[in-house]
Structure formats: structure tokens, C-alpha cells
């Protein structure tokens, strides 16, 4: 027979579990094989890469091409993209099966989260030397910047638009926390956006 203290202990454990943060929809740091295959199958059902819902922040590019923002390229969205590519050309995917499996595993094993920023500037090299950070609970995490994409000319507004990606090792940030994402162009003011990582898959 359990005593009063054991009963209280069980109740307290139940309360603690009830208030644990829900991480099922947080950014995936590690995927088991079932989750990996599920993401690929979801992509196959979507079929068209353009319809893959990559988590996004900032401006809607269809309405404001120079509004600033970007994509949070999670493992799940990357695997869905590969699934869509497989569905688009299944014969080729079957012929190149070893390479396809390698690409899937490489995406699942990625050690860094990539965030790709899109923004505009007045010169072809406007995206060079940009920096990016994540801020969580007062802590700043600096990203490792990649080489920017070649700038494209605009028909109106700033003369050029382009992309640059920043990589953040998974162990350096909390994948379930509200996050402030900031881009620091070499010319002009910094741009910041709020994103709740607990709601991103």
C-alpha cells in the first residue's frame, strides 16, 4: 500500500510532465529512421518541390521582393524536398539510388541549421561580408556565413537582390526557444525578425 508521501510524489511527477515544453513540433536536431522516411514520403506525396513548405520569416516574396526575410532550412523540409524530387523523376531516382540514399542520409546527419536570407542592395556585391546572429534569452549566437548567391538585377526599388546563408551548429542554440534572427548587411541597418523555433518542423 502506498503512503501519503508516495501519492504526493506521484502527483508532483504528473504535474511536472504535464508542464514539460512540447517539443514534437520543434526544429529536429536528430531524426530516427522512421521520422526520416516519413519526411521523404511526405515529400513524395507533395511531388512538386515548389510546394514544399520551408519554414519562412519576414516578407512574402510574392508581394514584396525586397522586404527582407529568409528560410529556415530544417532537416524535415530538406528531406521533403528530396522526396519531391524522387517523385518527380522516379526512373532516374531508381537508377541513381545509391546517390539518392547518400543525399538523404547526408541531410538527416547534418550538424548545422542553415538559414538563408533574401534581401536587396544597390551594388552587385551588396551581400558580401554580411553577418547573422540568433538571440535567445539574451544570449547571442553568431552564424558562419557562406558565399552569397550571384546578385540578380531588379526592375524597381534597390538595383539588386540576392541570398546569403548562415550556418548554426545544433549544439549552440535551443531548437525549442523563441528566437530573434538578425542580419547585418555591410551597408545599411540591421534587420531583425522574431521566430518561435518550438513551432517549426
Description of each model-found segment:
Residues 11-19:
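Bacterial N-terminal signal peptides
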Residues 1-12:
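Bacterial N-terminal signal peptides that target proteins for export
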